C-alpha cells in the first residue's frame, strides 16, 4: 500500500511539474502604452525576417496607406523597409484586414501572432492603432524584433483622449506641433487642442494693458496686423498640420478663446475691449464686438476647404467676470450665439465650463455641445450633464501644468494619476466608469508666466511622461495590471515616436556619447542635440572675438563664446538670451564644463587654466 501511495505521489508531483513548465512557457502580456485590454499568451515567438511582408486587402487604399506608414516606421526604427503587397498573406507575413466585431467598438483591434501576424479591426483607425502596438513591442526587442505568440484584443474606455497646449502666451514652433502629433499617435492619443490666443497678467507689465503681452497666432487676411509678430502659423502651415494629424488619426481642435483672454483683439481694435472688466475682456454690450468675432471665425470656417478642417471648433468662453446679473446674461447670450455660429459652418462647438459661474436665465444651447470640465466652481459637472452637455474631463487640480509658476503643477503627479485617476473623476465629482456623458479626458499646459525663460524643450520634458501615463488611464482606465513603479521604469524603454526625439535621449544609460580630439570650424557632430542631465567639457584658447561669435549651434539653441549684447559666454533659445558673468580673454587657455538639467538654468563650472 505504501508503494502504491508513493507511486501516486510521484505521479502527482510529475503532473504539477509539467503544469508549471507549461505555465512558464506561456508568454506574459507584452508591455505596451496604453496597456493592452486583453491578452491570451501562447508559447514561442514570431521573429520577422527579410522576407516578412506587409499584406493588405486588394483594392483597399486606406489599408494600403497604413501599410506604407508602417513600412516607413519600420525603416526609421529598425533600418529595414518591409515589402508591401496586395492580396492574401502567407506564413511569415504581417496581414492587415478589416473585420466586423461590435465588441471592439470604433477604435478597437485584434492581433493574432502565430507563424504570421494577423491584425484585424472593424475600422481603419483600429488597424492603425494596432500597428502602433506592434512597433512598441518590436522596439523593446531590437536584436531580433521578436513578438510573443498570442492573441490581443484591445479597445479604449474613452473616445476622446487628448492634450491642450497654450500657444497664445508662448509661441510653440510648428515643427514641435508636428512632432507632437506623431507622439500622440504612437500612444493612441487622438485629440490635440491648440489654444491660439491669450495674454499675460497685467500686474507683471506695470499694470498697463497697453504693455501687457498678448498674441493671436494664426495668419489673418480679414484683420491685417492682428497676427503676432514674434511667432505665428500661416494658414497653409495650419492646414498641413491638420492633414498630417488626419493621416495619423489625430484630431486637431483649434481654439479661439473669447470673450475673456482676448487682449490681442482689443490691442488690435481697442473699442471692443471692456473698460469696466479689463481690456482682456471683450465689451459684450458693443455691437462691434460681434462683428469682429463673426469676421474672425468666418475667415477660418467658410469655404469648401476651410482653414479649420476638423469636425470641432473650440470657442473658449472661460473666466469672464460675473460681477453683476446684467453681464452674466450677456455672457450667456454671447456663448449661445457662437455655439450656433460655428454650428452654422457644420462644426460641433466646444466650450470651457463656465455656466455655474455664469448662472442665469438666458438659454445656452447644450445639445451636441462639448464642455471642457476644468473647475467645478465654474461648471458643476453633474449639473452640466443634466443640462445636456457632453464633458471632457480636464480637472485643473489634477491635470494642469503651468511651468515654473509655483501653482498648479510644474510636473504632474503621474503616480497619483496612474493609481487613482480616470476621466470619470472630474475633480470631486465622480461618475461611473465609461459613463456616456464623459467623452474622455485631456491634460493641459498653460504658459501663464510670459517671458519666464521656459523653452519648448522644458515644456516637453514636463508633458511627455504625463502623456505616457494618461494614455494608459484614458484608454485602459481601471484595468491596469502593472504597479506604478514597474510602469514608470518600463515606459522609458519606448521611444517618443518613430523619428522623434524631442527629449534628446542618446542611448539607454548614462555615459560618454561623443568625444573629439579637435573640433574644426563648421564641423558637425553625429547628434542633433542632447537632452537634460548632460555635461559638456572642452578646451578652448581665447581670441579677440567679435560680439555674436558662436561656439556651438543646434536647430533649437546657440551657445556663444561672445554673446551679441555683452560679449560674454552665453546661450540663446526660444527667443531668450542668457549670459554668464564671464568672458574668455585673448590668449587664455581654459577647460570649461557646461551642465544642464530640467529644473535649473544651464550653468558653467569654474573654468580652469590649461598650460
Regions of interest found by a model, annotated:
Residues 511-572, 577, 586-587, 598:
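Extracellular glycan-recognition modules
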Residues 10, 22-156, 349-358, 365, ...:
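Acidic, contiguous N-terminal accessory segments
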Residues 363-369, 376-518:
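Flexible, acidic glycine-rich loops studded with aromatic residues
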Residues 278-368, 375-377, 381-382:
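Active-site neighborhood of glycoside hydrolase catalytic domains
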Residues 581-593:
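Trp-centered recognition loops
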Residues 103-281, 288, 294-312, 341, ...:
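Feature activates predominantly on carbohydrate-active enzymes
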Residues 8-18:
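Bacterial N-terminal signal peptides
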Residues 602-611:
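Residue-level detector of conserved catalytic or cofactor/ligand-binding positions
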Amino acid at each position: 500500500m505504501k508503494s502504491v501511495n508513493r507511486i501516486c505521489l510521484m505521479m502527482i508531483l510529475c503532473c504539477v511539474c509539467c503544469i508549471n513548465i507549461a505555465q512558464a512557457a506561456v508568454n506574459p502580456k507584452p508591455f505596451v502604452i496604453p496597456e493592452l485590454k486583453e491578452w491570451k499568451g501562447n508559447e514561442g515567438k514570431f521573429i520577422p525576417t527579410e522576407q516578412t511582408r506587409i499584406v493588405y486587402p486588394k483594392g483597399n487604399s486606406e489599408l494600403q496607406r497604413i501599410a506604407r506608414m508602417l513600412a516607413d516606421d519600420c525603416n526609421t526604427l529598425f533600418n529595414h523597409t518591409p515589402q508591401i503587397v496586395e492580396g492574401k498573406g502567407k506564413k511569415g507575413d504581417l496581414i492587415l484586414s478589416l473585420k466586423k466585431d461590435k465588441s471592439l467598438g470604433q477604435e478597437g483591434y485584434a492581433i493574432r501572432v502565430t507563424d504570421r501576424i494577423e491584425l484585424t479591426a472593424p475600422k481603419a483607425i483600429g488597424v492603425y492603432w494596432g500597428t502602433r502596438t506592434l512597433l512598441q513591442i518590436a522596439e523593446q526587442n531590437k536584436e531580433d524584433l521578436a513578438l510573443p505568440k498570442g492573441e490581443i484584443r484591445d479597445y479604449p474606455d474613452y473616445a476622446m483622449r487628448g492634450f491642450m497646449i497654450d500657444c497664445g502666451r508662448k509661441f510653440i514652433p510648428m515643427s514641435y506641433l508636428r512632432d507632437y502629433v506623431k507622439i500622440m499617435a504612437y500612444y493612441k492619443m487622438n485629440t490635440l487642442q491648440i489654444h491660439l490666443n491669450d495674454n499675460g497678467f497685467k500686474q507683471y507689465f506695470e499694470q498697463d494693458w497697453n504693455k501687457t503681452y498678448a498674441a493671436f497666432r494664426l495668419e489673418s487676411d480679414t484683420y491685417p496686423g492682428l497676427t503676432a509678430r514674434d511667432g505665428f502659423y500661416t494658414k497653409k502651415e495650419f492646414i498641413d498640420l491638420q492633414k498630417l494629424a488626419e493621416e495619423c488619426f489625430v484630431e486637431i481642435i483649434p481654439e479661439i478663446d473669447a470673450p475673456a483672454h482676448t487682449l490681442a483683439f482689443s490691442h488690435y481694435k481697442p473699442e471692443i475691449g471692456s473698460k469696466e472688466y479689463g481690456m482682456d475682456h471683450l465689451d459684450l454690450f458693443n455691437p462691434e464686438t460681434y462683428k469682429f468675432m463673426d469676421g474672425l471665425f468666418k475667415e477660418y470656417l467658410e469655404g469648401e476647404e476651410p482653414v479649420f478642417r476638423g469636425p470641432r471648433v473650440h470657442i473658449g468662453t472661460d473666466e469672464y467676470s460675473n460681477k453683476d446679473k446684467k453681464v452674466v446674461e450677456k455672457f450667456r447670450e454671447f456663448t449661445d450665439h457662437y455655439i450656433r455660429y460655428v454650428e452654422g459652418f457644420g462644426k460641433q462647438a466646444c466650450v470651457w465650463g463656465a455656466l455655474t459661474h455664469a448662472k442665469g436665465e438666458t438659454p445656452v444651447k447644450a445639445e451636441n455641445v462639448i464642455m471642457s470640465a476644468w473647475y467645478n466652481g465654474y461648471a458643476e459637472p453633474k449639473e452640466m450633464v443634466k443640462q445636456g452637455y457632453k464633458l471632457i474631463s480636464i480637472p485643473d487640480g489634477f491635470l494642469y501644468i503651468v511651468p515654473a509658476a509655483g501653482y498648479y503643477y510644474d510636473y504632474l503627479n503621474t503616480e497619483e494619476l496612474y493609481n487613482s485617476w480616470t476621466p470619470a473623476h472630474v475633480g470631486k465629482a465622480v461618475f461611473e466608469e465609461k459613463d456616456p456623458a464623459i467623452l474622455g479626458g485631456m491634460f493641459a499646459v498653460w504658459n501663464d508666466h510670459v517671458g519666464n525663460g521656459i523653452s519648448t524643450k522644458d515644456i516637453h520634458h514636463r508633458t511627455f511622461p504625463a502623456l505616457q501615463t494618461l494614455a494608459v488611464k484614458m484608454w485602459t482606465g481601471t484595468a491596469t495590471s502593472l504597479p506604478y513603479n514597474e510602469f514608470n521604469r518600463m515606459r522609458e524603454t519606448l521611444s517618443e515616436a518613430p523619428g522623434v526625439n524631442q527629449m534628446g535621449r542618446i542611448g539607454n544609460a548614462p555615459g560618454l556619447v561623443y568625444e573629439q580630439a579637435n573640433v574644426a570650424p563648421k564641423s558637425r557632430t553625429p547628434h542633433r542635440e542632447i537632452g537634460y542631465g548632460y555635461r559638456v567639457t572642452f578646451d578652448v584658447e581665447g581670441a579677440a572675438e567679435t560680439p555674436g561669435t558662436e561656439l556651438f549651434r543646434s536647430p533649437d539653441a546657440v551657445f556663444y563664446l561672445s554673446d551679441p549684447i555683452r560679449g560674454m559666454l552665453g546661450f540663446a533659445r526660444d527667443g531668450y538670451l542668457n549670459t554668464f558673468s564671464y568672458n574668455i580673454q585673448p590668449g587664455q587657455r581654459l577647460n570649461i564644463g557646461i551642465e544642464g538639467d530640467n529644473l535649473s538654468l544651464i550653468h558653467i563650472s569654474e573654468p580652469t587654466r590649461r598650460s
